[in-house]
Amino acid sequence: DQCSYCGIYCCPPKFCTSAGCRSP
């Protein structure tokens, strides 16, 4: 998977934003 870290780990289909991990 292409998980990102933005305060917490965030894996598709969720995505990182300036507010943290968001759902699509």
From Swiss-Prot:
Q: In which tissues is it expressed?
A: Expressed by the venom duct.
Q: Which UniProt keywords apply?
A: Amidation, Disulfide bond, Secreted, Toxin
Q: Where are the transmembrane segments?
A: none
Q: Which residues carry this modification: Proline amide?
A: 24
Chief location of this protein within or outside the cell: secreted
Q: What does this protein do?
A: 1 uM of this toxin does not show any effect on voltage-gated sodium and potassium channels. Shows a turbid zone of antibacterial activity against the Gram-positive strain Bacillus megaterium (ATCC13632), but does not show antibacterial activity against other Gram-positive bacteria, and on Gram-negative bacteria.
| Name of the protein | Conotoxin Lo6/7a
The protein's organism comes out as Conasprella longurionis
